[in-house]
Amino acid sequence: MMRILLFLATNLAVVLIASITLSLFGFNGFMAANGVDLNLSQLLVFCAVFGFAGSLFSLFISKWMAKMSTGTQIITQPRTRHEQWLLQTVEQLSREAGIKMPEVGIFPAYEANAFATGWNKNDALVAVSQGLLERFKEDEVRAVLAHEIGHVANGDMVTLALIQGVVNTFVMFFARIIGNFVDKVIFKNEEGQGMAYYIATIFAELVLGILASAIVMWFSRKREFRADDAGARLAGTGAMINALQRLRAEQGLPVHMPDTLNAFGINGGIKQGFARMFMSHPPLEERIDALRRRG
C-alpha cells in the first residue's frame, strides 16, 4: 500500500508540474486565442482521476480475472506428487524472497508458461501451465517459479499498473485538447462540442494509446530482466538459463495466455520489426545473454 501511496503522490506532483509548465509556456492563452476555452488544470485532474481509476481497478481484480481467463485451478489440498512439490517449492522461494506465501495454481495449457499477479506482494497468485509441469525438469520449473516470485517481490504488478495510470492520464488529456482544437479551430464550431470533437478525440485516443502502450511495454521488458535476476538469485543462474533455453526451444508453440497476463508470464512470444516495440518480454536470447554476463 505504501508503494501505491508514494507513486500516487509522485504522479500528482507530475500532474501539477505539467499544469504549471503549460501555463508558463502560454498554452492556455494560445488555445483561448484560437477560440478554445479550456481549463487545463481541471482537465488534467479529471483525466488523472479516470486514468488511474481504470488502472487500479484492473489491478485489484487481477487475481480473479486471471483465474477466470486461464481456467486456473488453485491448489488447496495437493492430490499428486507434482502438486505437493509445487506447493513446497513456492513456499520455500517465497520465504527466501521475504514475501507471504501466494496462492498457487495450475492452468490447462500445453505450452510451457507461468504467470504471477495480484495487487499486493503479500496477496498474490502464482500459476504454472500443465505443459510446464509435464515437460520441464524440476530445477527448470523451480527457476520459472523463482522468476515469478521475483515479479511479486519486486512489486511489478503494482508498478506497471501505476505506470499505465500515468499514460492513461496523458492520453486522455492530450486527446481532449486535440479534439477541442479540431472542433473549435478547424471546424469553427462555436456551440458546445460538435461531432468533430468526439471523432477527433476518439481517433487521438487510439493513436496516442498505441504510442503509450509502447512506453508501458518498454518498462515491462526492463522488469523482466529484474525478474530473471531474482530467479537466478533464488534458483541459481544455471537453472534460470536452462529454463529460458527450454522456453526458446518451444517458441514455435502457440501461446494461449491472455494478453493482460503476458507482462507477468515467463514467455511472452515473438514479434518482429516494428512490433518488437510492443513486446512485453525481451527476446529470450537477450535474457540469456544478460544472465550469462551476470555470472
From Swiss-Prot:
Q: Which GO terms describe its biological process?
A: proteolysis
Q: Which cysteines are joined by disulfide bonds?
A: none
Name the domain of life. Answer: Bacteria
Enzyme class, first EC level, given as a word: hydrolase
UniProt subcellular location: Cell inner membrane
GO MF assignments: metalloendopeptidase activity; zinc ion binding
NCBIfam families membership: PRK05457.1
UniProt family annotation = Belongs to the peptidase M48B family.
Q: What protein name is recorded for this chain?
A: Protease HtpX
- Specify the species: Pseudomonas fluorescens (strain Pf0-1)
UniProt lists the gene as htpX
